[in-house]
Curated annotation (Swiss-Prot):
This is Translation initiation factor eIF2B subunit beta. Acts as a component of the translation initiation factor 2B (eIF2B) complex, which catalyzes the exchange of GDP for GTP on the eukaryotic initiation factor 2 (eIF2) complex gamma subunit. Its guanine nucleotide exchange factor activity is repressed when bound to eIF2 complex phosphorylated on the alpha subunit, thereby limiting the amount of methionyl-initiator methionine tRNA available to the ribosome and consequently global translation is repressed. Pfam families: IF-2B (PF01008). The keyword Glycoprotein does not apply. It comes from the Eukaryota. It is found in: Cytoplasm, Cytosol. It comes from Saccharomyces cerevisiae (strain ATCC 204508 / S288c) (Baker's yeast).
Length: 381
């Protein structure tokens, strides 16, 4: 999306430098040059901070619409980068809460001024004072400080969210000590998840417990990540085995827990994993009554509902599965990169604020988002 296209919507939205930054980030999202929910969320917040600092508006609703337009542009650039839209919705919720709080306080103040208490019979004979002049002066001073106040509220909300994301692993790692037992066999089908990696390392170092981790190779897209994941665990004296995807069913009877990483968590309790084949592993665990724990930070919680699952699942090139062939040979090859896991195949979500059942995820989502901001696109809202 060009800077001219974005500026035409709001010509005074930001300076040219910010528009160039927006175009650069949009291009990086389209080319998939930014990988991982963590990196995308932090870069989006840094961009949003620059955007709000340079934004111009007459009313706070104008600022909210500008932020929504920016979020819509980023979501269209990378529709499956859910953390990008999630953090923008979090800041919108902060602004809307502040607007609602200011509106309520203004209403209470005007009511108390307009309707003074009559304390004695003598006051009944007096002409009440007209507070219109005072209200005019107060509203004038309020309008003068509105821009500065809401700008600071949004920037402070962004800083708080950045701190939350950077320290999100600490809250999750505290649960690892109580969750993993000694001499237990664990299985993880998401070797590219840094949160799962820190989760297992923390359980080994802080509790000094001995356990074995089985890592599925994730052929064909994550085989290299699986071996690197196993190598990092072995460096912390954790016994690790890389197993073929086809051996999961045979090994599941020995597994005590399945731990998966997430890319996005929807309000129905379902999740998008960053590796294909995770859904089959969770389905197998359900048949063997093996508990499945999904590790996710709050910034991965999305207010969207997966009505069309195929729209949220990514597909890659077929060159990893089959070599290049004669185009005249009609053969359709599917290389699924991500996977959707339904809520019935997940037992507990482990977040930085505690563990929750999938059926309770919707309540946590609505504590952080507003219903009006579920769809940033005006045509869908």
């Amino acid at each position: 999306m060009s800077s001219q296209a974005f500026t035409s919507v709001h010509p005074n939205a930001a300076t040219s430098d910010v528009n160039v930054t927006i175009d650069t980030f949009v291009a990086k999202l389209k080319r998939r040059q930014v990988q991982g929910s963590y990196a995308i969320a932090l870069e989006t917040l840094q961009l949003l901070m620059r955007f709000i600092s340079a934004a111009r508006w007459n009313h706070v609703n104008d600022l909210i619409e500008q932020i929504r337009d920016l979020g819509n542009s980023l979501e269209k650039a990378h529709p499956t980068a859910f953390s990008c839209g999630n953090v923008i919705r979090r800041i919108l919720a902060v602004l809307r809460d502040e607007v609602e709080e200011d509106t309520m306080s203004t209403t209470v103040t005007s009511t108390s001024v307009a309707e003074p208490l009559i304390s004695s019979m003598f006051n009944l004979l007096q002409k009440p004072e007209q507070p219109h002049q005072n209200r005019k002066n107060s509203s004038g001073s309020s309008s003068m400080k509105t821009k500065t106040d809401y700008r600071q509220v949004a920037i402070q909300g962004i800083k708080d969210l950045i701190d939350e994301i950077k320290n999100i692993d600490e809250g999750i790692q505290q649960i690892a000590i109580d969750l993993i037992h000694d001499h237990e066999i664990l299985l993880t089908p998401t070797p590219d998840s840094k949160t799962v990696l820190k989760f297992l390392i923390t359980a080994r170092e802080r509790s000094n417990r001995t356990f074995t981790v089985l890592v599925t190779e994730g052929f064909p897209n994550n085989t290299k990540n699986a071996h690197e994941f196993a190598k990092k665990l072995a460096q912390h004296n954790i016994e690790t085995l890389v197993v073929p995807d086809s051996a999961v069913f045979a090994l599941m009877s020995r597994v005590g827990k399945v731990i998966i990483g997430t890319k996005a968590v929807f309000v129905n309790g379902g999740t998008i994993s960053s590796n294909s084949g995770v859904s089959s592993v969770c389905e197998c665990a359900r048949e063997f009554r093996t508990p499945v724990f999904a590790v996710a930070g709050l910034y991965k919680l999305s207010p969207l509902y997966p009505f069309d699952v195929e729209k949220f699942v990514e597909f890659g090139g077929s060159q990893r599965i089959l070599p290049r062939m004669d185009p005249r040979k009609r053969l359709d090859t599917v290389n699924q990169i991500t996977d959707y896991v339904p809520p019935e195949n997940i037992d507990i979500y482990i977040t930085n604020v505690g563990g929750f059942n999938p059926s309770f995820i919707y309540r946590i989502a609505w504590d952080n988002y507003k219903q009006i901001d579920v769809h940033l696109d005006k045509n869908k809202a």
